[in-house]
Amino acid sequence: MRVLVPASLLVSFAANDGEELATMSGTMAGTLARLPAPLRSPVGSGTEVPTVSRRHVQVGVATMGVLVGAAALDGVRTAGRSRFYQDVQRLFGLHAYGHMAAALLTRGYVSGVATSPTVVLPVWWWARSRLRRAGVPDRSSLPRAVLVVGSWLVLSHALGAIWA
């Protein structure tokens, strides 16, 4: 349990972000174009659809990988008890719902949606149940997780834009 449960976060990340590495730069324009009109205007003028380069995605995924790797190591170090590990595990699990909601909203494939219900959610549910059965208290905090992971996500996109 000490290694396997925190390591499952890395497996989940590798699957989901591997899918994003393979598909995001090629599908982003189509995804944004399929958004309902009221949601398109904040991301562009409606005439040009923003895209992200493959390099941007590579840098962003690598940067997020540092955060997820650090969280998994902290999870191993604390047998899943650390707030940092639990926050990242929780938010990574929850983010799968965002992929699925985006696919429903755009009525099509969005990068990351294939591994969200097949890997990310089952791994997250399994990890939570294993921690609960082991008597590990849930110390995660959604606001704290959003602050930490969200800030890191902004950093990952900024670095991706700089190095693209």
Language-model regions, residue ranges each:
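Short amphipathic, positively biased membrane-proximal segments
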Residues: 1-164
